Each structure stands twice: as structure tokens, then as C-alpha cells.
Design a protein with these regions (language model features):
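A glycine- and small-residue-enriched flexible loop/hinge signal that marks low-structured segments
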Residues: 21-240
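Surface-exposed interaction regions enriched in Ser/Thr/Asp/Glu
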Residues: 1-25
Length: 241
């Protein structure tokens, strides 16, 4: 009743200052005394929890070539056995402080920085919700991949492409002039192995089901064209071990 709702409530919490986190912290390593940090700590998942890592993401840092390459290394033969799939982002600003705020620039940046791993999927740009919260698309993609996996008894048989996400527009940076693009224009990204978000069917959805290795018209290993194909291959080989 109303009486139970009367009064005040206080709460305390700690918040991480992620501005102090460097690429080297995400990459991490293992010390001679057996301390694990960053991506290297993935090796602790199986011996401590008997769980197999199948997705690796680092939103906010995966746009760094050093971190992306470390993720690609970390996803292979974890504990000498398991393989995982990387979900990463392209930057909105490059290492020289130049904006990556158009489709043409995003495609050029991806190629120049070799964000083309077949064990990965990359996203651009970002997205914002009705409260002004900005999301890396890799964050939203991992949520939808996990949701789809759960609906299929943890079998990664469904892509996150065309899944609804809680945003209202694309985001290219606080000072960007870009007003966004539609599904048809977004195909320029997906044809170059870049997944994105578009307005479709009366809602905003993730768009693109290719791996980062895909380029339309290029000679691409058929198994590495679609994200779901690579994830299913990993699931099968992981299950056999």
C-alpha cells in the first residue's frame, strides 16, 4: 500500500573512470607470479568456471588496431582448445584526431587498418537512444547474439542482423554534420564487411550478417562470409573437445 512506499532511500556505489583505462590494460598479460589481466584473463574462464568463451568484445577500445589484433589473437585456441568470435567497432575519430564520420571514411579506415579478420565482425558508426545515451554497436550486437543463442539452447545458429535495438538514430560524434543513412545506402558498408544499424520496419535494427573478412565481389572463403557460419564452426569444434 501507499504507506509502504513512504520514506526515503539512499544508495551508494562506485563508478569506474574508464578514461584511465589504456589499450595496454585491455590487452593485459600474465606475470611470472601468475597474475592475469586484460584479455589474457580469458584463459581463467574454463579452469575456474568450466565455461567456454565464445564471444569477445571490448566496446570503447576495440577500435584500436592494437586491441583488435590482440582480440584476434586471444580468440584462438583458448587453453589450447577453444575458439571464440570477436565483435568490434570502427572508430568515429582516428589516431590523428581526424573524424571518421562518413561511409567513405569508414570503409577506407577499415581497409587501411586491416580490420578484416574472418573470426570477427566490425560495426560502425554508433547509436543513441531517446535519453541521449550513446552506444557502441558492438555492445548491442553482443546482447542480441547472446539473446539469440539462449533461444536456441546456446547454439549460435542465428545472426544478430535485423534484430531490433533500443535506439533512435545513428551517432557519428558530437560535432559531426552527418544526419545518417538508410538501409539502401547502408549496403555500401555491408558490402565491405562492416555491419551497422538502420531504421527498418518501423524500428531500428542491427544491419549486416557478414564477417569483417567479407568484401562484395572479392574472392572470400565461403565459410568466412557470414558471421553465423564462423560461429557455428567454432561451436562444433569446441563441442568435440
Amino acid at each position: 500500500d501507499d504507506a509502504q512506499l513512504a520514506g526515503s532511500l539512499t544508495a551508494s556505489f562506485s563508478e569506474v573512470d574508464d578514461s584511465e583505462i589504456a589499450d595496454s590494460d585491455i590487452i593485459g598479460g600474465v606475470t611470472s607470479s601468475g597474475e592475469y589481466s586484460g584479455l589474457s584473463a580469458i584463459a581463467l574462464l574454463y579452469p575456474e568456471q568450466f565455461a567456454v568463451c565464445n564471444l569477445i568484445a571490448a566496446p570503447g577500445w576495440s577500435h584500436s588496431p592494437a586491441v583488435y589484433n590482440a582480440m584476434l589473437t586471444a580468440c584462438k585456441k583458448i587453453n589450447g582448445h577453444w575458439d571464440a568470435f570477436v565483435v568490434a567497432d570502427l572508430p568515429l575519430v582516428d589516431s590523428t584526431a581526424q573524424a571518421v564520420d562518413t561511409i567513405t571514411k569508414a570503409i577506407a579506415w577499415k581497409k587501411a587498418n586491416a580490420f578484416t579478420g574472418e573470426r570477427s565482425k566490425v560495426y560502425w558508426p554508433q547509436a543513441v537512444d531517446n535519453l541521449g545515451n550513446v552506444f557502441h554497436l558492438s555492445t548491442l550486437a553482443v546482447v542480441e547474439l547472446m539473446r539469440a543463442d539462449f533461444s536456441h539452447n546456446s547454439v549460435p545458429m542465428e545472426t544478430c542482423g535485423n534484430k531490433a535495438i533500443p535506439v533512435i538514430k545513428q551517432y557519428f560524434g558530437a560535432n559531426a554534420n552527418n544526419r545518417g543513412f538508410d538501409q539502401q545506402t547502408g549496403k555500401e558498408l555491408t558490402q565491405n564487411g562492416i555491419s551497422t544499424a538502420v531504421a527498418w520496419g518501423g524500428e531500428w535494427v542491427l544491419w549486416g550478417d557478414h564477417t569483417a573478412a567479407y568484401t562484395y565481389g572479392a574472392d572470400v572463403d565461403p565459410r568466412a562470409i557470414f558471421d553465423v557460419s564462423m560461429r557455428m564452426l567454432m561451436h562444433i569444434t569446441n563441442d568435440f573437445q
